[in-house]
Each structure stands twice: as C-alpha cells, then as structure tokens.
Curated annotation (Swiss-Prot):
Positions annotated to bind Mg(2+) 1: D251, E268
Lipid biosynthesis as UniProt keyword: no
Organism: Methylorubrum populi (strain ATCC BAA-705 / NCIMB 13946 / BJ001) (Methylobacterium populi)
Protein name, UniProt field: D-alanine--D-alanine ligase
Binding of Mg(2+) 2, residues: E268, N270
Sequence similarity: Belongs to the D-alanine--D-alanine ligase family.
Length: 307
C-alpha cells in the first residue's frame, strides 16, 4: 500500500496564496511519484482534521507565522505524525530574524549589523544611519520590507500607521549593496547557488519573487570559484547552526560593487522555501540533477519526529 501523505498548505498568514501554490505543486508531484495524497488547507480545526486523517507523514508547505515558526511542528510532534523540513526549535529560531542572526553570528557566519526597535520609534527618528533596511521580525516573502536611502530625511511613516500589520517590533539593519544570492541546502549538502536579478527595482521584493518575469535567475551564479564555494559553506553552516533539517534556503548579499567592501553576508535562512516547480529550491535541485518529483519524494522519505 502506498504511503499516505497529508500536504499542509494555505493557513491564515499573509503568505497564504504562496503556500497554496507550493502545496498544490508538491501534492501533484507526490501523486506522480505514486503516493496517496490528501491536500489539507490548514485552519483552526487542523488538530481534528489530522487526527481523523491519520496520515503516514505530513509535507509542510505552509509559509509564514504558524506554518514555519514552530507552531505546526509542535502540533505534529504531539500527534506523532512524521513531518518534513525543520523541527520546533530550528523553525522558531530561523523565523525570528534577530535571534537567528545571534545564533549564526556565534557560528562564525557574517550577518548585517542591526537592532530591534519599536515601530513607532522607528517612524519618529532613524534607528540607523541611512541607508538601512527595516523589516518585520518574523515574516517571509519580503513582506513589509522597506529600504531607507541616504537621501531620505524622514523615516518611513507607514511604520506608525494602521496599515502596518506586521507587529510592534521591527528589525533595522545596515543596507548591504551588491548582488542577491541564494543557496539551497538539502540535508547535509549545499546544492548550488543562484544569483537573482530583479527586472525592475534594485532588490528581490514580493513582486520580483512572484510576478511573472519579475526576476532573472542566473544558475549557477557567475562568481569566482572561491566565492561560490564560500556561499555554499556559509549556507550549510547557517543551516547546521540553527539546527535545520530537510530543505532550507539561505539568502545572501555579496558586495562586489566598485570600491565596495567585498562583504558576503547571510541575510536569513528560510526553513520553508517556496516549492512550486519554478521556485528557487526546485530550480537549484534540478540543476544538481534532482527532478521535482525526486525532490519531494526525498523530503517525504526524510520525514520524521524529533527534528
């Protein structure tokens, strides 16, 4: 009898629609690999739904709060359902950007300088000397990220408005110029490095990530061999320092601008990266010789408790 996999998707975070795309793509691929699949749009009744389903494993395709912060992982541990990706502690650590930086810095990984501030204080006066970046403590898909340029005399006022829905605390970080890089990690190995070039704008924002033609992915990234290898080393070190399991993706900046610092820093580690067939991790896996079906099969066969 084929293994029964519950693919968890949707949820109620701001990344719900992205999660539905990831979940449906994974479910379709698993069906193609011969698994019995139930698509589960996660809601408040998720404990009852999973108790009734009794799946052999859960593929976690959720993004954002509740899906990648240790919450759903804790529930799956309680219900004794083996699951994919990282466990409770690693998920909670990686989701909280400042605490993740503390752990990575202790492991020797270069991260941007920054500080946590109240959003209202950040709207009154610059928390750092521009240019800097303001971002929510625990969101993905570049939700709520603001770049404050040198020429900006006043800090972003949206931080103090009712339009800001990403929590009371924000992270202000020194802006790192240069190239946007990302590296996929699968288990105990770094699969490869992609450079991301937004078609419009200077950075990889929500539209560049998800709008058709919003960005160009250069795979493998055109880097000197020692830099390419260093990116992979940093991604793997960050993955291991945070205690990640299964698949993760590290996002980095490399400042090779004329007169730049040459800095290579890890911005964050995503424990629940996008999983459509055209998402970054599946692209990198395909370049490494792993089809999308083989990738999701590996993830399900790697599923376990106590992650």
């Amino acid at each position: 009898m084929s293994k029964h996999v519950a693919v968890l998707m949707g949820g109620w975070s701001s990344e719900r629609e992205i999660s539905l795309r990831s979940g449906n793509a994974c479910a379709e691929a698993l069906e193609g690999e011969g698994y019995r699949v139930t698509r589960v749009d996660v809601g408040p009744d998720i404990a009852t739904v999973l108790t009734d389903l009794k799946p052999d494993a859960a593929l976690n395709a959720l993004h954002g709060p509740a899906g990648e912060d240790g919450t759903i992982q804790g529930l799956l541990e309680i219900l004794k359902i083996p699951y994919t990706h990282s466990g409770v502690l690693a998920s909670a650590l990686a989701m909280h950007k400042e605490r993740a930086k503390t752990v990575m810095r202790a492991a020797g990984v270069s991260v941007p300088e920054g500080r946590v501030v109240n959003r209202h204080d950040a709207a009154k006066s610059h928390p750092l000397t521009p240019p800097y970046v303001v971002k929510p403590i625990a969101e993905g898909s570049s939700m709520g990220v603001i770049i404050v340029r040198e020429e900006r005399s006043h800090p972003p006022q949206i931080l103090a408005s009712d339009e800001w829905v990403y929590g009371e605390e924000v992270l202000a970080e020194t802006y790192i110029a240069g190239r946007e890089l990302t590296c996929a990690v699968l288990g105990d190995r770094a699969l490869g490095v992609t450079e991301i070039k937004p078609v419009s704008g200077e950075w990889y924002d929500f539209d560049a990530k998800y709008a058709g033609g919003g960005s160009i992915h250069v795979l493998p990234a055109d880097l000197k061999l020692n830099i390419y290898q260093r990116v992979q080393e940093l991604a793997l070190t960050a993955h291991q320092a945070l205690g990640c399991r299964g698949v993760s993706r590290a996002d980095l900046r490399y400042d090779d601008t004329p007169g730049g610092t040459g800095a290579l820093v890890v911005l964050e580690v995503n424990t629940q990266p996008g999983m459509t067939q055209t998402s970054l991790v599946p692209e990198i896996a395909a370049h490494a010789g792993l089809s999308f079906g083989e990738l999701v099969r590996w993830m399900v066969e790697d599923a376990s408790l106590n992650r």
